[in-house]
Amino acid sequence: MAKWQCELCLYIYDELNESVTWEALPKEWTCPVCGSGKESFSLAASNPPAAASIGVETGSGEEYLAEWRRPADDFEVNMADIHRLAMTGKSIIEPMRTRIPTFSWDDILIKGAQLAKMPLNKTEPIVTQTLIGPAAAFPLILETPVFVSHISFGALSREAKLALAKGSALAKTAICSGEGGILPESLAASWRYIFEYVPNKYSVTDENLKLVDAVEIKIGQSAKPGMGGHLPASKVTSEIAAIRGCREGEDIISPAHFPDIRSKEDLKATVTDLRLRTGGKPIGIKLAAGHIEEDIDIALYAGVDFITIDGRAGGTGASPKVVKNATSVPTIFALARARKILDSRGADTVSLIITGGLRTSSDFAKALAMGADAIAVGTAAMIAAGCQQYRICNTGKCPVGIATQDPALRARLDVDKSALRVANFFKAVTEELRDFARLTGNDNVHHLSLADLCTTNSEISSHTPLEHV
């Protein structure tokens, strides 16, 4: 009796527990979770290596030496990837963040107030209201410092975008459009909406710019910095094609940079133009954490109202695995460096937003204490909506209907139920942020500071202002 595993959703077909052997299953049989065919299954790692030939892709060379194939090696950890490259001749594409461990927020601890500073009682009110772009004519005001990051309609289903918009609205926080343009129903359902301005300039009209609450110019993201976006043809529905001005069923490629932004003067002209066209809404910029100080100096020259730094390990809908694994400054260090350069430049009216791998209220509290004004969350918001981390976003076969355009899979997602889950998540973490403020003796979550933190990691204490325990 053997076990066969779906390479997309990791479902296991165990012959021991089934009434039909794998070989006896009809050719049209599909995975009960994600709907993939038999060709997407391979022998599970728990089987003996010589159990059978394993087929993934016709003509891929998968059958060659299959009798002796081993799924992995404890010492040569890249063996499976090398075999895959050798068989396909193509780079491995993966969603979500890198699996390689990075510096953890768990290495940072919050110091509770005792005598030197008194904690606050549960009954004492705590301010969570958050101001982004205070120097703008119309600053963005949220009731919590945590909001939904940029994830496009295309990477996500219509239902997922609506659930995130409705859920964030119930919590009186913002949702971002993502790089795929504006889904009108998502904008209408939102409480506050941040539009992502990208090289392909989807949805960039004077009417739309007047409707949104802020605009963020996307320069890069940590999981694939310096690379453009790619939406596979299988995800390009007629509706997505209409929003993006493309053809249905064809791959959509986003450029790696803006063709009309080649200098800091060009960036300044773009910021000025967007500020005028929005009527004075906050204009920001999103940067992958790399040349942090130099990039921030250019952003400040351009006159932005807020800067988003995306650190390692930020997520993505799809990225070359090798790029995701090898790039970007870890979020903790990126935040410390960004705060330092902004302070040294006297940029106290420029809001700092951090994103990339933050999940829980304790992560958020630590980021606020390190100098972030707000936190954008993508994966955490998706999980709140119902994501089960199958990590197959790039295939379009998400079993829970979030990262797919398949009508049958999308039908599994109940917009209102997922919206309530998202709202509950934001409300819960906001209340937990109040608790962290109280236990550190602060009546405002934005008053959390470095004095409230310490670290058990000497690398962090050596390269950030955080003191070691």
Where are these regions (language model features)?
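Conserved, well-structured core domains of diverse proteins
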Residues: 47-146, 150, 155-166, 174, ...
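Glycine-rich phosphate/ribose-binding loops and adjacent secondary-structure elements
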Residues: 258-410
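Short linker/helix segments within small regulatory modules
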Residues: 18-28
